[in-house]
Amino acid sequence: MHPRFQTAFGQLADNLQSALAPILADEHFPAMLTAEQVSTLKRESGLDEDALAFALLPLAAACARTDLSHFNVGAIARGISGTWYFGGNMEFLGATMQQTVHAEQSAIGHAWLRGEKGLAAITVNYTPCGHCRQFMNELNSGLDLRIHLPGRVPHTLRDYLPDAFGPKDLEIKTLLMDEQDHGFALEGDALTQAAIAAANKCHMPYSYSPSGVALECKDGRIFTGSYAENAAFNPTLPPLQGALNLLNLNGYDYPDIQRAILAEKADAPLIQWDATAATLKALGCNNIDRVLLG
């Protein structure tokens, strides 16, 4: 078990601990639960779906990287496939506050990059901020997404974001978590191809500036992130943050990164290179390259 889970795990009910122990045994537990695992945990713990999600929130919050605020937020995105995806907020010392990943973004980005096609609900241990409410409004689940908070009855995003502005106001038809393939040819080595593949699935209907990032760890594991734009612009999630999020959720740390590749167009209206390189260098990675999309 990864050390970050030990405190939260020890506070769970005994029957839930027994059911979770085999799942968490891998130090690189991927911070997600398959539909089958969720069913097993419900059966062994006697908890219904909502109660189980609340019980597991401390494990999601344990994934947070909060070197600045020391305020851990955890989220669990529940996919329409039945798979659950953990998320935790991330802060990056030496970078800028704008590079921060919120817990809801972490869980949602996690689900999207794992290939989930839509979300039914999200469970969070603190009220979503306005930034996250706007981020969630980019999803194909729209304002019907259910939000579960401790001590409150569930509400939809519509309740938390009245008079909402979103992609439909800009006549955007393809939404975040809809399947997308921008058709860039895969070329180069495995890491370069992974970055291009990440760019192929990015969501960029406002700037038409595709980008993707691939990070290679010292053990050869590769994590990718795809660019995810938002109708309100500022809640946009850069591709590096998506990749760092997956790396962290899988139990890796920044010193594990040995190489990074950014894929983007040289003539795109928005360029990720400077921000990507600056953040990676702040985290100790200097082996950074860029491949230009055709």
Swiss-Prot record:
Necessary cofactors: Zn(2+)
Residues that coordinate or bind substrate: N89, M90, E91
Entry annotation: catalytic residues: E104 (proton donor)
Residue intervals of the CMP/dCMP-type deaminase domain: 48-168, 186-294
Cofactor binding note from Swiss-Prot or TrEMBL: Binds 1 zinc ion.
Reactions the enzyme catalyzes: cytidine + H2O + H(+) = uridine + NH4(+); 2'-deoxycytidine + H2O + H(+) = 2'-deoxyuridine + NH4(+)
Enzyme Commission number(s): 3.5.4.5
Cited Gene3D superfamilies: Cytidine Deaminase, domain 2
Entry-linked SUPFAM superfamilies: Cytidine deaminase-like (SSF53927)
Binding residues for Zn(2+): H102, C129, C132
GO annotation, biological process: cytidine deamination
A GO molecular-function descriptor: zinc ion binding
Highest taxon of source: Bacteria
GO CC term (a single one): cytosol
Keywords: Hydrolase, Metal-binding, Zinc
PANTHER family recorded: CYTIDINE DEAMINASE (PTHR11644:SF2)
Family: Belongs to the cytidine and deoxycytidylate deaminase family.
General function of this protein: This enzyme scavenges exogenous and endogenous cytidine and 2'-deoxycytidine for UMP synthesis.
Subunit structure: Homodimer.
Identification of the protein by name: Cytidine deaminase
Species this protein is from: Citrobacter koseri (strain ATCC BAA-895 / CDC 4225-83 / SGSC4696)
